[in-house]
Amino acid sequence: MRLSRYFLPVMKETPADAQIISHKLMLRAGMIRQTAAGIYAWLPLGLRVLRRIEKIIREEQARAGALELLMPTLQTADLWRESGRYDAYGPEMLRIKDRHNRELLYGPTNEEMITALIRDNLQSYRDLPRIFYHIQWKFRDEVRPRFGVMRGREFLMKDAYSFDIDETAGRHNYNRMFVAYLNSFSRLGLRAIPMQADTGPIGGDLSHEFIVLAPNGESDVFYHSNWEQPTRHIEADFDDPKALQSIVNDHISDYAATDEKRDPLREAQAGDKLRQSRGIEVGHIFFFGTKYSKPMGFTLPGPDGKPIPIQMGSYGIGISRLLGAIIEASHDDNGIIWPEAVAPYHVGLINLRIDDENCRAIADSLYQRLEAAGIDTLYDDRNERGGAKFATMDLIGLPWQVVIGPKGAEKGVVELKNRANGEKQTISVENAFNLLTAGHQQR
């Protein structure tokens, strides 16, 4: 994409109402613009990152055996009355009446909707186990929306729901999602620590939240220093309950807790390896058994023909929130540092002198070759000062920068910069192309 044809309204100054670094950088980098309190329009650069995050999450959900569907944003109030949550949920739920005076709501979550949908379309215990998920915009009328996409009123969520005939099978599906979440966050370049959590209004007796460490996090967290080790992708057989349980056990054996769930005994055992930081919740999973299936009459005939209430679980990832968490965990004084897996573009190509024939020829040729090789490239071909171009590329945080100037063009060389560590090297155009495409093939 040529930057001269792109829509990238970067800001030189930090908006006064932006309090945390992710909000500041997303505004300055032209990723979002606020349209109302806690509601944002996603501009092209921000939307590309959202789509990349969605892709990774979809792949890991599919690997764990989940099927994608899409439920409506509007739900009937009667569904929520079936579960008993309509009056209990509170004013953060947006309630609506249509022209026929029928009560609707803009769903803040989908337990009731998915329970009714699957209840009406499964016939036998042989149809289980099942996991369904969808990715959908949601709305919660927060009293005080703040921190940009981290605490907005409208947000993008991945919700998954599991259905099983007994508790043993239900906990197996819970572990499937536990491991799928670990792999999703690892691929996104995040170290997400699973911590035992309260079930809150969702309900149930088993729950973990996944916390990313960040200086500007929303809550205090306490953890063993082993959690500071690099993440790795977990090769798992999702159909093997014992193997999955072993993986889960490995990931809850080292101490980690939010302020509400602290355990003084385990903290004492951790000793000088205990760490304290701030954290951001990026995912939350629940096993709530028959909390929704019983009041909503969701049973299936078991092997003996008798009706059995279905065991359920719920699994959420805040996708738009994740984007903010990635920035909180990966930035410097100059701007964002995107992990390669989610970067909106892989390469930022800078032509320092668009009026120089040599520069233009080399830059145009390299841009065309990179695009043909499948390397997403943002080509700064604007008639701007070099300093402004460097500042823009650092701000938006693309993993690699290729700089072409008049002196280098005469020699057939370019400057290649790694945004993450700042290392620069002057190499031939061909070597730069080979390095960038080789890295792409390895991914």
UniProtKB/Swiss-Prot annotation:
It catalyses: tRNA(Pro) + L-proline + ATP = L-prolyl-tRNA(Pro) + AMP + diphosphate. One of its GO terms (biological process) is prolyl-tRNA aminoacylation. Its EC number is 6.1.1.15. Gene3D superfamilies: Anticodon-binding domain, Bira Bifunctional Protein, Domain 2. Keywords: Aminoacyl-tRNA synthetase, ATP-binding, Cytoplasm, Ligase, Nucleotide-binding, Protein biosynthesis. Pfam families: HGTP_anticodon (PF03129), tRNA-synt_2b (PF00587). It is found in: Cytoplasm. One of its GO terms (cellular component) is cytosol. GO terms for molecular function: ATP binding; proline-tRNA ligase activity. It is an enzyme of class 6 (ligase). Catalyzes the attachment of proline to tRNA(Pro) in a two-step reaction: proline is first activated by ATP to form Pro-AMP and then transferred to the acceptor end of tRNA(Pro). Homodimer. Belongs to the class-II aminoacyl-tRNA synthetase family. ProS type 2 subfamily. This is Proline--tRNA ligase. It comes from Zymomonas mobilis subsp. mobilis (strain ATCC 31821 / ZM4 / CP4). The gene is proS.
